[in-house]
UniProtKB/Swiss-Prot annotation:
Annotated Pfam families: DUF520 (PF04461)
Keyword terms, alphabetized: Nucleotide-binding
Native source organism of the sequence: Clavibacter michiganensis subsp. michiganensis (strain NCPPB 382)
Residue spans crossing the bilayer: none
Record-given protein name: Nucleotide-binding protein CMM_2802
Amino acid sequence: MADSSFDVVSKVDRMEADNAVHQTQKEVEQRYDFKNVGASIEWSGDTILMKASSEERVKAILDVLQTKMIKRGIGLKSLEEGEPFASGKEYRIEVTLKQGIDQANAKKIGKIIRDEGPKGIKSRVEGDELRVSSKSRDDLQQTIALLKGADVDLDLQFVNFR
């Protein structure tokens, strides 16, 4: 029997992220507590920039964005938030979307699989994803459950289960 496998990836659906940013923008424009504070949200590339006249207002925009991201199925671990900083008369926060599994996290995930996972599981890095293989599908399902409960700084998805 051939080996079964799955891929561990960390990707953000850009359409869902775009929808969440647009919903946040619409809510910021309509809410009374954001009137006359210069509140805005912009998205370019993998960076979302929020602006407002006070630090509290810009944090409130971030909170609205996080709520919309969760409702659209995007985990908060895939957002890297900067600290609020003053720029002229306004405060700004930059949020970056994290995609892909970097080498350090790939090694960390591989170590978790080796140390705590069932015997006979093999993992290897392929670009920005991790391929996990085994002869037993049950072992792969146990590995998925293990990784879902593991403390990893990424929003992990499991794809291509064969």
